[in-house]
Amino acid sequence: GNTEKQLAMLLDMQATVLIGTASYGLLLAEEAKKRGIADQLKLRKAIFGSERWGEKMRTRMEQILGLESYDIYGLTEIYGPGIGIDCDLHCGIHYFPEYIYCEIIDPQTGEILPPGELGELVITTLTKEGMPLLRYRTRDLTYLDPEPCKCGLPYPLMGRILGRSDDTVKIKGVNVYPGQVEDVIRMTPGLSSEYQMIIDREDGKDSVLIRVEEDPERHNPRAAWEFKHNIKAIINIIADVEVTPYQTLPRSEKKSKRVYDRRNLD
């Protein structure tokens, strides 16, 4: 926290590596640009974890701060600071099979899924003492990549975390993960990384409003229409869409809240 102090320390200490949440990294980047000090920072690398973050957020932070960012994955219950991280190709998370055994299951049935299929990550620790974990359900949604990474590292790959099974919202019978919305944002020109999804229910009918910020570097007058069309085609829900000016949605020094489910489901 304390953005003013963090920016001062980055300048005074000429730090070359930044570690934190991606939400806070974006906040620091935007504040540095706003104050005209982004080009004075010496950052070269960043490691972000503790939350799901997408490619548009990665691109935005890297453009402003002139660094390369890495996605680290970990759980308090297993090891610290992380149990996997992406490589220079940024095509997934390399994990360490000598320490953990990973499986993917159907979060509803518990059935083990084959490599490449999306499901809930289950981890068994192989060397942990004191509190070993057997088939621990992480609630994190990903898949195991059956192919070796082209970077040449011997460590297997899992996909970047799409979301959590307990963050899933059901809208008109369709399970929706926040990561799916971020993927649609990524493929829609003219949109930035920040969004909110607001779900209401009136007279027994669900409604969805998605607010997403415009990309300050790329104007697309059809962005709202294209995003709405892509949401319907890919996620199979109908949503109202508002494209808001850049930096109008709230920023966070911790984890950003994306989904607001205001339905009374009792």
Predicted features along the sequence, with ranges:
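Active-site glycine/GP-rich loop and adjacent strand/helix microenvironment
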Residues: 1-266
